[in-house]
Amino acid sequence: MNIRPATHEDDGFLREMLYEAAAWNPDWPRERMIAALADPMLERYHRDWGREGDAGVIAELDRQPVGAAWYRLFTDEQPGYGFVDEKTPELGIAVVPLHRRKGIGETLLRALMVQAREEGFQALSLSVAVHNRSRMMYERAGFEPVREEAEGEFWVMRAELG
C-alpha cells in the first residue's frame, strides 16, 4: 500500500469518499441513505478543495485509490458537523467498501494526524455515529468525546496532537 498526499486531481475521489463516510451504514433504509447523500452541508467538506488549511492523504493499492483521509478548517459562521473551533481542522475519512477492515483507515488516520501536527495544528476533530465501528479506531488514536449531537446518535470527538 502507498500513502501519498492528496492533490487537486483527487477532488472527485475525495467527494466519493465523503459520501461513503456519510452513508456509512449499509443497513440504513434507502430513503435515509438518499437523504444523507443529498445533504447540501456535505458539499462544505470538498468544495474548492485545496484552499488554505486543507490537507489530505490517499491510500493506493496497485496505483488505484482505495481510501482517503483529509481535514479542513471551518468557521463559526459555517461549521462542519464535527466543528470544535476555528483553529481545529475537522477530518473526514473513508475506505472503499471492498477494502475495509484491513487496517487502511487506521494507516490513513495516523498519517493525517502526523501531517496535521507537522502543519502546526494542536488538535483534530470529527463527527461519528455512536454505532459506527470506526469510532473504536478513533478512540485508539486518542480521540475523546467533546459533545453529543442528534440526541446522542452522534459524537463530536477531538484528539490532541501534542
What are these regions (language model features)?
Residues E90-R101, V128:
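A short, internal acetyl-CoA/4′-phosphopantetheine-binding micro-motif in the GNAT/acyltransferase core
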Residues R101-V114, E139-R140:
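Conserved acetyl-CoA-binding loop-helix of GNAT-fold acetyltransferases
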